[in-house]
Regions:
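N-terminal glycine-rich phosphate-binding loop for ADP-containing cofactors
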Residues: 1-233
Length: 233
């Protein structure tokens, strides 16, 4: 699929992706202010962005997949062309300063990044303060309890994305999410609001021609089940 856009650094895809990373970093800082450890915050933000938002990957797993060094490079290319906005991530820089780069091996398996992987599954979280990986099992129980259960009607991305009744299922799911006030759903709602703002700003700031183009890049390029401009929320 061909999606046109204005000739702007980052275009639609990276224009969205880099800002999504920066918002995830903002959430991490807020959670650390609430006295959660760094590995706990990474676990929770990644879980909310994948499970509660029904995406194929959590935000930090996606950064690992692309490569932390690649993300830093994209941000450095975009920054001189973006006015009144800081496209730089201290979180990305800290990991690279610790020689943690993510990316993939030649056979497609995942290199260590924000997470360490075992047979494709997240097994541990890098803690820059301790300069080592912390097992997911050390943080998952506390974090899952804090976030609370997924809203009624939830389906994992893999089971939802190709369903012919996907639109109706998403409407019902987000109706349940919006009615909930657990910490996980509150975080998800703020994430969705920022998601929508990013998509709208890409049109407002003349990166994308129209909202449908932003949605197309997210759905067909990032394989999301829905775009940022929709009637679900």
């Amino acid at each position: 699929m061909f999606v046109p856009s204005y000739d702007v650094a980052g275009f639609i895809g990276n224009g969205y992706f880099m800002r999504d990373i920066l918002y995830a970093e903002q959430l991490i800082n807020e959670l650390q202010n609430d006295e959660f450890s760094y590995p706990e915050t990474v676990y929770m933000v990644n879980k909310v962005s994948q499970d509660f938002l029904i995406r194929p990957m959590g935000i930090f797993q996606l950064v690992d997949y692309v490569g932390i060094d690649v993300v830093q490079f994209i941000m450095s290319v975009m920054q001189p062309h973006v006015e009144k906005e800081n496209i730089q991530s201290e979180l990305i820089d800290i990991h690279l300063n610790n020689a943690v780069k993510g990316g993939q091996f030649a056979d497609g398996t995942q290199k260590d990044g924000f997470f360490r992987y075992e047979k494709g599954k997240i097994e541990a979280i890098f803690d820059p303060g301790k300069k080592r990986y912390i097992s997911v099992s050390e943080v998952s129980e506390k974090c899952d309890e804090y976030l609370g259960p997924l809203p009624e009607g939830w389906l994992p991305w893999k089971k939802l994305v190709h369903r012919p009744d996907k639109d109706e299922l998403l409407k019902k799911y987000f109706s349940q999410l919006l009615a909930s006030n657990s910490p996980g759903t509150v975080m998800a709602k703020s994430y969705l609001q920022r998601f929508k703002e990013i998509g709208s700003d890409l049109v407002k700031n003349k990166v994308a021609f129209k909202f449908d183009d932003v949605n197309a890049v997210l759905i067909y390029g990032f394989h999301h089940a829905y775009g940022p401009v929709n009637d679900y929320f």
